[in-house]
């Protein structure tokens, strides 16, 4: 059984493979430095096994962003502004320095977060009975896609052979504002969904792990929106994955999951404290 913390198990898993899709999960342990170490393990294992094409699921790097006021954002205890981005971004170096033939895949936000329990923008019913998506994004656009379509784009990259090796490929189905997300979910559910655009300070004060990091992420998305969206190539994404679903198509296909998630959120909210 492969373990991201143990290089030898990864080497055994990669043995004889032509390609390897490599990804880590920050939210399993909430440690950016551990995620970077796991990336190094994946890169070393791919090198040892002689993988011909690795796809490394990376992320943007908050170190490349400077606020319009020149201010630093609040940092996590280990010095990261957006740890769930930065640990992956710093992992890029392992693949390049080891000479692993790698495509650096930059996937957009998963729309599945809309029905993921505990996600900041899970669709939930408010005290007034109205469904809402709550985000500190103002009118900023956010590249997004369904998780399954990320896999299909990766398959397209493997099929392309060496064409994208050594390049960073940002994939997304479309870029949507919070209001557009709410409208698509509303259409799928046949019920009004409101977009609550909240200030960043509300998120920073929220009682969930990594609240500062989530607020930092949305601050970057909002303040550098054109540059942020520019990392994602919608036309290339569709050429890699001709079945790529639009937001409306994804919402319609996931109507039941959205309904189940909302029901669970309602029950949790109604539990006595």
Predicted regions and their residues:
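NAD(P)-dinucleotide binding in Rossmann-like oxidoreductases
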Residues: 196-198
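Short, charged low-complexity linear motifs
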Residues: 42, 91, 96-97, 230-240
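Cofactor-binding loops of NAD(P)H-dependent oxidoreductases
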Residues: 1-2
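Short, basic/glycine-rich phosphate-binding loops at helix/coil junctions
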Residues: 20-21, 231
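A hydrophobic C-terminal alpha-helical subdomain
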Residues: 164, 200-273
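Oxidoreductase cofactor-interface core, primarily capturing Rossmann-like NAD(P)-dependent enzymes
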Residues: 5-15, 22-37, 44-55, 59-194, ...
């Amino acid at each position: 059984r492969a373990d991201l913390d143990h290089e030898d198990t990864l080497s055994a898993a990669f043995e004889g493979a032509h390609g390897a899709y490599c990804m880590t999960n920050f939210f399993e342990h909430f440690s950016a430095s551990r995620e970077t170490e796991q990336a190094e393990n994946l890169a070393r294992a791919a090198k040892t096994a002689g993988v011909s094409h690795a796809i490394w699921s990376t992320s943007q790097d908050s170190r490349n962003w400077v606020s319009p006021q020149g201010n630093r954002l609040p940092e996590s205890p280990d010095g990261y502004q957006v740890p769930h981005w930065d640990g992956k971004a710093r992992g890029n170096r392992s693949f390049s320095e080891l000479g692993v033939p790698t495509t650096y895949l930059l996937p957009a936000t998963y729309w599945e977060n809309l029905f993921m329990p505990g996600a900041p923008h899970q669709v939930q019913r408010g005290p007034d009975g109205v469904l809402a998506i709550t985000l500190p994004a103002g009118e900023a656009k956010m590249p997004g896609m369904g998780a399954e379509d990320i896999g299909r784009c990766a398959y397209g990259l493997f099929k392309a052979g060496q064409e994208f090796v050594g390049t960073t490929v940002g994939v997304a189905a479309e870029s949507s504002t919070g209001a557009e997300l709410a409208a698509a979910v509303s259409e799928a559910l046949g019920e009004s969904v409101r977009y609550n655009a909240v200030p960043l300070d509300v998120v920073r004060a929220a009682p969930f792990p990594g609240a500062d990091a989530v607020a930092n992420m949305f601050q970057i998305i909002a303040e550098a929106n054109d540059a942020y969206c520019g990392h994602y190539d919608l036309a290339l994404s569709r050429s890699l994955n001709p079945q790529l679903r639009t937001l409306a198509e994804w919402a319609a296909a996931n109507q039941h999951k959205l309904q189940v998630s909302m029901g669970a959120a309602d029950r949790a909210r109604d539990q006595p404290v």
